[in-house]
Amino acid sequence: MKRFVFAAAAVCVGVFAQDDASYQKLMKDLGRESGVIRKADPKTGPDVAASAEKIAVVYDQSKTFWAKRGNTEDAMKWSDEGKEAALELASAAKAGDAAKAGSAFAKMGGTCKGCHDMHRDKLPDGTYKIK
């Protein structure tokens, strides 16, 4: 079953994030799942773990998007680091380790901020544009 899930995720990586609109949808999906985690106190349990695992897949999809744009090694690095943090968070949430889960969530947020600061512009209407 695990092989099927990872195979399905690998197929999705090639399907999603082909253009800016698809990428923005991915980021909204990531934001929704991050919101589930942000509201959880403590940051443990099956809902937090499931959201973190979904976020890890989104980071893979994000990396595919940035690889196609070229000259975005920093964004691909943040995608890798974000995925790693999301998987750490999922593991800690399953184990009930609130301290590790909180630390991993903070690390994950740092990767989001790093990429947003470099690759996102806020428009006058409050929406964002990918640089």
Model-identified regions with their sequence ranges:
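The canonical Cys-X-X-Cys-His
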Residues: M108-H119
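Short, solvent-exposed, charged loop/turn and helix-capping segments
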Residues: D60-W78
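Inter-heme linker and motif-flanking segments adjacent to c-type heme-binding CXXCH motifs
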Residues: G96, M118-D125
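Positively charged n-region of N-terminal signal peptides that target proteins for export
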Residues: M1-F4
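Immediate post-signal-peptide N-terminus of mature secreted/exported proteins
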Residues: A17-S51
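Hydrophobic h-region of N-terminal signal peptides that target proteins for export
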Residues: A8-A17
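Amphipathic, charged alpha-helical scaffolds that flank and support histidine-based chemistry
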Residues: R38-A49, E84-M108
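Short cysteine/histidine-rich metal-coordination sites, predominantly Zn2+-binding motifs
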Residues: G126-K131
